[in-house]
Amino acid sequence: MAGQPTISRFFKKAVKSELTHKQEQEVAVGNGAGSESICLDTDEEDNLSSVASTTVTNDSFPLKGSVSSKNSKNSEKTSGTSTTFNDIDFAKKLDRIMKRRSDENVEAEDDEEEGEEDFVKKKARKSPTAKLTPLDKQVKDLKMHHRDKVLVIRVGYKYKCFAEDAVTVSRILHIKLVPGKLTIDESNPQDCNHRQFAYCSFPDVRLNVHLERLVHHNLKVAVVEQAETSAIKKHDPGASKSSVFERKISNVFTKATFGVNSTFVLRGKRILGDTNSIWALSRDVHQGKVAKYSLISVNLNNGEVVYDEFEEPNLADEKLQIRIKYLQPIEVLVNTDDLPLHVAKFFKDISCPLIHKQEYDLEDHVVQAIKVMNEKIQLSPSLIRLVSKLYSHMVEYNNEQVMLIPSIYSPFASKIHMLLDPNSLQSLDIFTHDGGKGSLFWLLDHTRTSFGLRMLREWILKPLVDVHQIEERLDAIECITSEINNSIFFESLNQMLNHTPDLLRTLNRIMYGTTSRKEVYFYLKQITSFVDHFKMHQSYLSEHFKSSDGRIGKQSPLLFRLFSELNELLSTTQLPHFLTMINVSAVMEKNSDKQVMDFFNLNNYDCSEGIIKIQRESESVRSQLKEELAEIRKYLKRPYLNFRDEVDYLIEVKNSQIKDLPDDWIKVNNTKMVSRFTTPRTQKLTQKLEYYKDLLIRESELQYKEFLNKITAEYTELRKITLNLAQYDCILSLAATSCNVNYVRPTFVNGQQAIIAKNARNPIIESLDVHYVPNDIMMSPENGKINIITGPNMGGKSSYIRQVALLTIMAQIGSFVPAEEIRLSIFENVLTRIGAHDDIINGDSTFKVEMLDILHILKNCNKRSLLLLDEVGRGTGTHDGIAISYALIKYFSELSDCPLILFTTHFPMLGEIKSPLIRNYHMDYVEEQKTGEDWMSVIFLYKLKKGLTYNSYGMNVAKLARLDKDIINRAFSISEELRKESINEDALKLFSSLKRILKSDNITATDKLAKLLSLDIH
């Protein structure tokens, strides 16, 4: 072989201008057999900044990727091993080139190059003022059309960001920023000092990790992929002839769309954007007093669209905040200047960006589709405008189909649901710590599926106010509890649910076209398993479900409807047939190309003609390679010779035998013992085979999209299947909770509001393995609608009133509750004022926050409300606190339709208000005098008893907090002095009143006696 130097492909571009004519004949590895289909642009090679990091070997082992022509074999006779750098002049030239290019301060990235140089001519070194390279020009064109996005562009086996995008991404990801032009339009004054754009890069295998980090910073990120391969570009007459590969945006991600549009395996159970929604919101103010809102909210993971129109006083915005809490917006589309600053601040506080988007003209067929959809749900014109706006916004993410399905639209507010306001959700620990331990959600959640968990969350957020629906859930719980141990059908179904993936999310991803093949396979497999399960138990279903006289039909109309509909839908779906079209072994294939090409079982797939045609062409090329191998065997006289692999189709020859090989054989690489070659014919055939492989991948991708469309055609039916399974999962979850010890079915009563319970317990505290003392609840017109509860600090007052509210909410969700017996009315809302905290962000003090909560309660309560008022007035002075509390109780006690109220206080004088609606209670305790303590210690009994208590026993709490005993004794003595002063002051006031009445001369003795009797004497 020739004595020319063998060099790595990393150096080829750096030295080619200095090489001799013989050296210039060297062929790039990317042009040889087995070159990868993803390549770098040639002009990207021109942008290399340094070759100093590249290793040049001078021993007998060749550099990876080196190739040499067989034409130089005569000069290699003295060397039976690989070639070496034995040319001193060449080394000097190489050193000069390395130094010169190092001075240009441009980063070396040639390790990504794979052969795009086939399509561009060699260019001379450029000055900083030279024109942009074709790749940079392509990047600029893309960015100028997508200024609102961060572009992450594939270049070889890396993804790169350029100019201002690179600055942003490098800062967030903490990766190196290579110097260059900092703005895409070259507006930065320093840009003239550079000839390429600044950039940062990361390996393609890290794309999913970095994407999630970028969108978490509220960035809109577009992933730009190569739209053609080197093989197609070379052999396809219809391919573009430009010097760079065509690149297109393949996906656009935001925080709202990443979870549902990502094709990656997402980490953990929490999926970004799982419960979040995208809003389109408009706000109009009438006469400066009333603000009217129109809202469309879409959750892409659940495939739910919520619509709402509501009014509230300008600057109030309480209803808006409730919707923000429930729907958790992550993006909000608004018209320019549509929202005032105080409303925009609500969204800023939750890191929700406002996107100013004007209305766009939609295509005629889209307008018609929206019109047809609206015929079924009857939205107002303002809501239809928002639907159109959201549709045009979704087009960018390929999620617009969700806006055209009428069955997924639902109103936010409903007459059959109660809405818990944010205060109640927080103070009652409904979702404390995201539903973690110690919350009501944690207590009730025994769901087996992700979609069941999300539905249970909706049930808890919106308890029922329709007693018929509540009773149906309670009947279902009783039925499933008795049936589950006697039915193989239910037992097996419950086991299947334990291993069921998120069917609803996968179904929506199938509709969006973003799901992976493995995900589709497991989705079809799971639905098919449900189909088989129902087929297997048809006799049981016929006996108990298909007739309303069956056991299930009699016990639970809700379960009867659920399973009757499930049985019908599962018996008609085509998904089991679609499952037979999949090649299971290909689904499990780790090689992504093989997974794509072999995904379909062509014996069952009904659109396989295009794939089969390309496969036949590929087989023809492989046959020709076999023929070529037979010729090579004859020439080398090695009848058992085989290609080294069926990718590169290389011929392996011992180094001692290479001198007799044909001149046109091309050496690809070598070891100390053997060299590997490709012949001109095998090279052409492998390139042709690569071309057909790329065609097959392209055709398989097209067929995969058609396959997803076939599944999507059953979207409405499949969604019903999933929602019915979710509802059953929720019933199972509530049944599991209801099986706890001493849980009882609530009884609902008509007439005036009442809660009557015997030995009721706080469900959350009890579930934390704390021994909880049960208490009775007596609230009704006869037993008092207003309960004023006094007692020592830490005596259990707040726990008791929370207990009443939690039992009410659990009962109206449709769950059994912890009590021996409970009878209650239906409540339309539960309003709370519990705890003390300020709002530093809004500049509100503790007392102002307290008063704002009271105002909210006064505006929203009615006769069917349950109010929890915990120590109102504690945020201000004692006299003001007493006055406000007194005024509140008097106000409610004089209402003709007074709601049920639980009022805890440390102001015992409030219990002296006279009203037939008021009952006084206190949390019981036992006093104990201990040695060395001036104050009375208290043993809490946590039992509710009638009557008032006049001491809060704050010293006892100070002791529990382990304050120094001397400090507590001093505090007690001061407290006693103040108490005596207060008693003396009251006595003086009484004496003064007596004196004034007795000295009055202008009234009769009878009137004097009446006034004396009216004095408040204790």
Swiss-Prot record:
Gene3D superfamilies attached here?
1.10.1420.10, DNA repair protein MutS, domain I, MutS, connector domain, P-loop containing nucleotide triphosphate hydrolases
Return the Acidic residues bias intervals: 105-117
Q: Which UniProt keywords apply?
A: ATP-binding, DNA damage, DNA repair, DNA-binding, Nucleotide-binding, Nucleus
One Pfam family from the UniProt entry? Answer: MutS_II
Give the transmembrane ranges: none
Q: Where in the cell is it found?
A: Nucleus
Q: How does it assemble?
A: Heterodimer consisting of MSH2-MSH3 (MutS beta). Forms a ternary complex with either MutL alpha (MLH1-PMS1) or MutL beta (MLH1-MLH3). MutS beta interacts with proliferating cell nuclear antigen (PCNA/POL30). Interacts with SAW1.
Task: Write down what this protein is called.
Answer: DNA mismatch repair protein MSH3
Record the organism: Saccharomyces cerevisiae (strain ATCC 204508 / S288c) (Baker's yeast)
Which lineage is the organism of this entry classified under, starting from the top rank?
A: Eukaryota, Fungi, Dikarya, Ascomycota, Saccharomycotina
